């Protein structure tokens, strides 16, 4: 197709493959199945959840989608709004707004280009939060700093300029800016390190510091490998630590914290089973259904479920993204 790179063509080709239903049926034996016996595609990205229906030419009531592509900056923005309970059930996500910013250049060491993407991110944050007036903002860096693919949140905190203590001490005299937001940050770690739920730590900090808004930053899981380290998702529904890899914890949401919560994430891992799906669909296209089932039963290890894959250069990429 015109305007698509070879990877995109390959992905579209295999997703329309006749081998796909058989692959998901067999993967479902090892990877957690739903009522239909099909494999649950694990993704934190609302845009990927929406694409499941698009591929089947199904419109979901209560889900609105807007797409925009900035050709000059090579930035694609997709806004998914879930407006009804029906839409939330179909998408498997809470009602709210999900903004996805995609760009091939995100994983490259280009500071000027990252600045342009940051401006786009800032624009959407202002729309969701409203930063025209001074606000107190708590940034929560979720994830395990000892695991590279999960260290995005802590890395972001390390790169931020905190201002809450300066404002409390000196007021606006500490800056020449007319508007200065009180920024504070915390890296709550993971339960295996602290013995506490992330939500418990954040709830305590929120109760004492009383921010106007909480922004939680976390590494996510994607369905499609081409979105790894090239996509930013912003949502006003908050975030659930560990949900991308199946470690469900109490969510950081407005309902739990009694303050507006914005979730920001970048997918850094993909479920290994989806890679098998993409590879096998192309390989097995020439086999009939019975041969496909026999081959997959022999080849797919039951230990595949729960395994996640990340790019080999993720350590450098995390530095750029943060």
Sequence positions of predicted segments:
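An N-terminal, well-structured beta->alpha segment
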Residues: 87-129
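Proline-aspartate-enriched helix->loop->beta-strand connector
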Residues: 206, 211-212
